[in-house]
Amino acid sequence: MAAILSMLAPLLNADEKLEFSDYRNLWSLTAHRDRKTKDELLSLSIRTAVFIVLLRYGGYFGPKETPYGASLSSAEAVVAGMIFHIQEGITFNLHQVCGVVSDSILTGVAAPHVREFGTALFPTLLLLNHACDTNTLRININGNQVLMVAKRKIRAGEEVSDNYGIHYLSLTLEERQEALLKGFAFCCWCEGCQKDYPRMKSLRSQLPEDTEDKFDHLRENIKEMFRKGNHEECLKTSQAMIQLLEKARIPPPHRNYELASLSLISCLWKVYGNKA
């Protein structure tokens, strides 16, 4: 923790809080220039040139008329370098901003159908590493904000992780590694990758008989409560499903943990999430 705080020190305020509105966060993003192709670098250069032209003729660099095609002034060159650098970092550090497509498809026991509005930078989220078997869930709320909750008990000293949309439930190990390397320039070594967790249909589903009966009862209750519009109680019941599995010492990965997580995130989208 001390090492992490030392790295973050230039970006923290007096209360040791990360100021998300501080543009030094953008400057500090990992750029991975060595992983970019010539075409990608050319595209960034062209966009940078367009920005500079717009700033120049918008009067940002002063009222003086500048002939079309004139070389960059020293101020323009500095700003161009900053814009290029920030664009490099943004490439690998964007998060989706989504909304749930239709309330009618939310049943409380199935994955919600969400639509991407766009992408954004969330400096606090960038402090979390990706895991294909993440211990959190997140949704978009109030337009441009994020709500993140634990999907199971996170013990003291355990890393809090995020998922970049590439999950072990839907993609094989090889597919995940390829997608993460291409989209985020890293290879994942989370527990799900090290142990090559199976996909949803192949996950363990066995439970002690009394635990299974209680779990199935809670899940049926969620369907009924969701149908009646009692979504706050659905949230509590989803959490109770997870707590039931933890009390029975059922280790992840397990199909019932994922079923409980689906219920939890469906309820979260219904109660708090953006609507498409």
How should each PLM-predicted stretch be described?
Residues 2-12, 104, 110-112, 130-256, ...:
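C-terminal SET catalytic tail plus cysteine-rich post-SET Zn-binding segment of SAM-dependent SET-domain
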Residues 231, 274-275:
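TPR-repeat structural position
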Residues 225, 268-272:
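Residue at a conserved register position within TPR or TPR-like alpha-solenoid repeats
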Residues 23, 57-60, 68, 117, ...:
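Sequence-level detector for tyrosine residue identity
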Residues 1-131:
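SET-domain substrate-recognition elements in eukaryotic SAM-dependent protein methyltransferases
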